[in-house]
Amino acid sequence: GVWHGKAPISDYDSEKSRFFSEYGFQSFPEFESVKRYAPYPEDWDIRSEVMMSHQRGGDHANWLIETYLLNEYKKPRDFRAFLYMNHVLQGDAIKTAIESHRRQMPYNMGTLFWQHNDCWPVASWASRDYYGRWKAQHYYVRKAYDDILISSVVEGDDLKVYAVSDRLENTSGRLQLQVCQFDGTVVPH
């Protein structure tokens, strides 16, 4: 799998099952929460003794977070940016999984990520930290479980777009796709 098996996040798009549960992706708490247990700047490093003591996923887990992050994004400029990008990474990983599971409807009819909250201030799979602060994952999950989902996935050279509805009645709509550059400029077709 993606976390324990160290597979790429994109592997979520190829997993098949009738029901998914207890899958997840770790992140640290947000910076304001971290400062409550690591108040000194010398501890603001994922390898510091304090940060390692607030990691219950094993000695390799902080390294794994960093490895995934650097595979997906540029190296963050500082510790605070690292925490922020780690939240984006966690959110994107879970969004990828949930959307993939929902696209498999009606073969797959359930998906429960791990986990909602923490019982201690720690790096974990939770979408809300010990202090109740929402991580990016919490926002991503809320959107990924919308009753109407528009989801895209790259398969080879193709971009496939899916519409998934959990509504009991038929729904119609109009979908407009645009390709944009990173600066937001729309690419003409």
Language-model segments: which ranges?
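Intrinsically disordered, low-complexity Pro/Gly/Ser/Thr-rich segments with frequent PxxP/GP/PP motifs
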Residues: 173-189
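Substrate-binding clefts and catalytic carboxylate motifs of secreted carbohydrate-active enzymes
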Residues: 2-171, 185-187
